[in-house]
UniProtKB/Swiss-Prot annotation:
Binds to 23S rRNA. One of the proteins that surrounds the polypeptide exit tunnel on the outside of the ribosome. It comes from Methanococcus maripaludis (strain C5 / ATCC BAA-1333). This is Large ribosomal subunit protein uL23. GO terms for cellular component: ribonucleoprotein complex; ribosome. PROSITE patterns: RIBOSOMAL_L23 (PS00050). NCBIfam families: PRK14548.1 (NF011118), uL23_arch (TIGR03636). Part of the 50S ribosomal subunit. Contacts protein L29. Disulfide bonds: none annotated. Keywords: Ribonucleoprotein, Ribosomal protein, RNA-binding, rRNA-binding.
Length: 86
C-alpha cells in the first residue's frame, strides 16, 4: 500500500493539539484496511520519523483513526509544523 493511500488527513482539534504538545502524539485518519505496520511504514516514509506506538480506533461513522506516538528523539510539533497544522 502506498504511503499516500494509507495516511488520509491529520485531525486538528484542541484535543489533538494537546496530544502533540504533551504526549508527542499525532492523530490521523487512515485507510480503513491499513494495518499498524502499514501506518508505521507510511509515517517513516512521509515524515522520516520513528514510531514508538500506534493505537487505532474506528469511529461510529466508519472512519479509522490512528493515534501515533513518536519516539522521544522525534518531535511531534515539528512534524505537525511541516504539515502546517501547528
Amino acid at each position: 500500500m502506498d504511503a499516500f493511500d494509507v495516511i488520509k488527513t491529520p485531525i486538528v482539534s484542541e484535543k489533538t493539539m494537546k496530544l502533540i504538545e504533551e504526549e508527542n502524539r499525532l492523530v490521523f485518519y487512515v485507510e480503513r484496511k491499513a494495518t499498524k505496520a502499514d501506518i508505521r511504514a507510511a509515517i517513516k516514509e512521509l515524515f522520516d520519523a520513528e514510531v514508538a506506538d500506534i493505537n487505532t480506533s474506528i469511529t461510529p461513522k466508519g472512519k479509522k483513526k490512528a493515534y501515533i506516538t513518536l519516539k522521544a528523539e522525534y518531535n511531534a510539533g515539528e512534524v505537525a509544523a511541516s504539515l502546517g497544522i501547528y
